[in-house]
């Protein structure tokens, strides 16, 4: 299908993305994609998406920051991006290293701001096409999906066959050696072609992007393998590369050919053919496959070792790819441990059952490392002498506490909440003793009296350490205020940003069917364009940032 670009507002761009998603789901392939990527509306939306990120203030090898481009006249910026993308020669990424949880260093490539804008323009057009072809149970780097959805679906698969002898209580926990660093470029381009991207100009740009290399300590290094970690387009490309693996397991062992009207009948046909059902869940390069017997789990591990080697040009780490019994150890996945255990006993013995259900718990080993990092942030409060900077650090500590609590929310996590609160409180006690040696006890106030986060702390009498500024108290919050929340329904696979129904489902999911207080207007309306043209005619030109801020 050759695309003719006819959109002049962000609303029309959204409708164009919806069309791409719909046609891609029908198996249509696309040419003429480059014209959509260099459209002025696409460029405005791309810059608008990148601008709020902290990374926009980080320069690449050319030392140019986002502010430089925002101060350009909009016509000049449009021409710069359009000319660069039509004759694309990406600059090498700047290599940085960030510390991982295990103490090792993760390489991170920082592209130039111009390359980031071009990659975002490409992502806006390519993502709807790819999303329509992606496997339903992959959750990493996809819109409207998160780690908690993967965990919820794993638990629901275990619970769905609670009375069956084929309950999936064995798992293969996969680990791919250097997945993103060993992606085969030639194979990736073939997979992009198969997924429906038939514009050879776009494929050539992606090929050049993959081979751009990086600068490390003033030395250039070429990249013949892998996707650059840190690039905007890299997560989408890695999902495209691993999508065949998802569908291989799904079509062979989960939903073979979909010959029946109902899924339960299809699973029954699978069992009649002598195949044990298997359930695949993937988040980025981490994946778990559930099955019902130890023998099938080991057979699957052996089969996938050969599959990755010969079909994906990747290697499974035999030391880190485990076969796990969920009834004993549980699987370690995305910071959680999922086990198959008996239901909690109720006061009525008549309701007791030996049936196993899935239970997610926090991975306390990983959580302990995060708590240690959090304690360091609490200690920083004592390094400041001015109350305003102390309050700012308290606010940052609170954001980390709430982030940890919300991440653990889908699991059975009350013990984890108390571990966070206990260690933070002990650290705060030592800090306040140093800051206020004689009156640190008076600096403990009830949560409900704090001026920061009043809605969160309303009605709580537990005391916390705080500082006073102009008669108002600013204190450290508690994790236990965020209640554990288990969602029994499986993830709604129809939630997507590329259909009206999918967006409506997502809004209902986030707001619990409560109406939104307001709706955000379009970023780029005809009135904005008219105003900019009028201003240009008066003898002065608004820069690109002014143009974007007209809402």
Could you say what each language-model-derived stretch is?
Residues 211, 217-220, 312-388, 392-395, ...:
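A conserved non-catalytic segment of reverse transcriptases
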Residues 92, 136-137, 149-316, 323, ...:
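Conserved polymerase palm-domain catalytic core
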Residues 382, 391-450:
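Non-catalytic, peripheral interaction segments enriched in hydrophobic/basic residues
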Residues 432, 436-550:
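Extended C-terminal regions of large enzymes
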Residues 1-75:
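Non-catalytic, polymerase-adjacent accessory regions of viral genome-replication enzymes
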């Amino acid at each position: 299908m050759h695309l003719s670009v006819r959109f002049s507002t962000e609303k029309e761009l959204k409708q164009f993305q919806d069309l791409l998603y719909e046609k891609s789901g029908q198996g249509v392939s696309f040419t003429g994609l480059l014209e959509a990527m260099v459209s002025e509306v696409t460029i405005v939306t791309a810059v608008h998406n990148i601008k709020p990120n902290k990374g926009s203030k980080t320069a690449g090898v050319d030392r140019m920051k986002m502010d430089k481009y925002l101060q350009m006249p909009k016509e000049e910026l449009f021409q710069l991006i359009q000319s660069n993308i039509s004759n694309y020669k990406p600059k090498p990424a700047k290599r940085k290293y960030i510390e991982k949880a295990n103490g090792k260093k993760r390489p991170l490539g920082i592209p130039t701001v111009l390359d980031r804008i071009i990659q975002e323009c490409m992502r806006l057009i390519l993502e709807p096409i790819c999303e329509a072809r992606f496997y339903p149970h992959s959750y990493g780097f996809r819109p409207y999906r998160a780690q908690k959805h993967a965990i919820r679906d794993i638990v629901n698969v275990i619970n769905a066959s609670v009375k069956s002898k084929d309950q999936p209580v064995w798992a293969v926990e996969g680990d791919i050696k250097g997945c993103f660093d060993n992606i085969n470029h030639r194979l990736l381009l073939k997979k992009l072609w198969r997924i429906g991207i038939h514009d050879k100009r776009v494929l050539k740009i992606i090929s050049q992007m993959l081979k751009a290399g990086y600068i490390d300590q003033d030395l250039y290094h070429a990249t013949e393998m892998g996707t650059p970690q840190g690039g905007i387009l890299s997560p989408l490309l890695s999902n495209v590369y691993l999508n065949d693996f998802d569908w291989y397991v799904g079509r062979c062992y989960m939903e073979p050919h979909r010959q029946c009207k109902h899924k339960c009948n299809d699973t029954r046909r699978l069992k009649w053919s002598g195949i044990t059902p298997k359930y695949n869940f993937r988040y980025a390069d981490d994946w778990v496959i559930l099955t019902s017997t130890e023998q099938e789990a080991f057979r699957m591990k052996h089969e996938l070792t050969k599959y990755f080697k010969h079909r994906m040009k990747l290697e499974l780490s035999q030391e880190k790819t485990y076969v796990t019994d969920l009834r004993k150890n549980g699987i370690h996945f995305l910071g959680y441990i999922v086990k198959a255990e008996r239901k909690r006993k109720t006061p009525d013995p008549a309701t007791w059952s030996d049936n196993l259900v899935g239970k997610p718990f926090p991975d306390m080993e990983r959580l302990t490392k995060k708590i240690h990092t959090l304690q360091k942030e609490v200690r920083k409060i004592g390094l400041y002498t001015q109350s305003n900077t102390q309050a700012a650090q308290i606010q940052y500590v609170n954001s980390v506490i709430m982030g940890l609590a919300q991440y653990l929310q889908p699991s059975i996590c009350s013990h984890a909440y108390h571990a966070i609160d206990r260690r933070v409180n002990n650290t705060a006690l030592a800090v306040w003793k140093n800051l206020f040696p004689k009156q640190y006890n008076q600096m403990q106030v009830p949560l409900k009296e704090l001026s920061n986060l009043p809605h969160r702390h309303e009605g709580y009498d537990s005391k916390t350490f705080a500082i006073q500024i102009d008669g108002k108290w600013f204190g450290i919050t508690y994790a236990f205020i965020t209640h554990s929340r288990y969602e029994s329904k499986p993830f709604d696979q129809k939630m997507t940003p590329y259909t009206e129904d999918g967006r409506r489902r997502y809004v209902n999911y986030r707001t619990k069917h409560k109406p939104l207080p307001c709706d955000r207007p379009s970023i780029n309306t005809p009135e904005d364009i008219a105003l900019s043209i009028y201003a240009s005619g008066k003898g002065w030109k608004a820069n690109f940032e002014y143009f974007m801020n007209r809402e």
